[in-house]
């Protein structure tokens, strides 16, 4: 399974590590994915992987 948010499709971000001696190595920041249950329009409960940022947004919209 891909490490992506199933609602917003947010994936990992890529960048550089910078040490004190200024050497550069590539690194990856993964999204903080959590499994949660959500109701669809028919009232059916499904389990999806979403990021914690998306969970906060859903709680603010009372859709969680």
From Swiss-Prot:
Listed GO CC annotations: ribonucleoprotein complex; ribosome
Which InterPro entries does UniProt cross-reference here? Bacterial_rp_bL28 (IPR050096), Ribosomal_bL28 (IPR026569), Ribosomal_bL28/bL31-like_sf (IPR034704), Ribosomal_bL28_bact-type (IPR001383), Ribosomal_bL28_sf (IPR037147)
Give me any GO biological process, just one: translation
Which Pfam family, an example, fits this chain?
Ribosomal_L28
- MF terms in GO: structural constituent of ribosome
Keywords on record? Ribonucleoprotein, Ribosomal protein
- Domain of life of the organism in this record? Bacteria
Region span, Disordered: 1-21
**Record-stated family:** Belongs to the bacterial ribosomal protein bL28 family.
UniProt-listed PANTHER family: 50S RIBOSOMAL PROTEIN L28, LARGE RIBOSOMAL SUBUNIT PROTEIN BL28A
Name of the molecule in the record: Large ribosomal subunit protein bL28
Organism source for this protein?
A: Mycoplasma genitalium (strain ATCC 33530 / DSM 19775 / NCTC 10195 / G37)
Q: What is the lineage of its organism?
A: Bacteria, Bacillati, Mycoplasmatota, Mycoplasmoidales, Mycoplasmoidaceae
């Amino acid at each position: 399974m891909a490490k992506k948010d199933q609602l917003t499709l947010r994936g990992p971000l890529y960048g550089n590590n910078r040490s004190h001696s200024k050497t550069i190595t590539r690194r990856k920041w993964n999204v903080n994915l959590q499994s949660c249950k959500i109701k669809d329009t028919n009232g059916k409960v499904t389990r999806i992987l979403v990021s914690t940022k998306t969970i906060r947004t859903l709680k603010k919209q009372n859709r969680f």
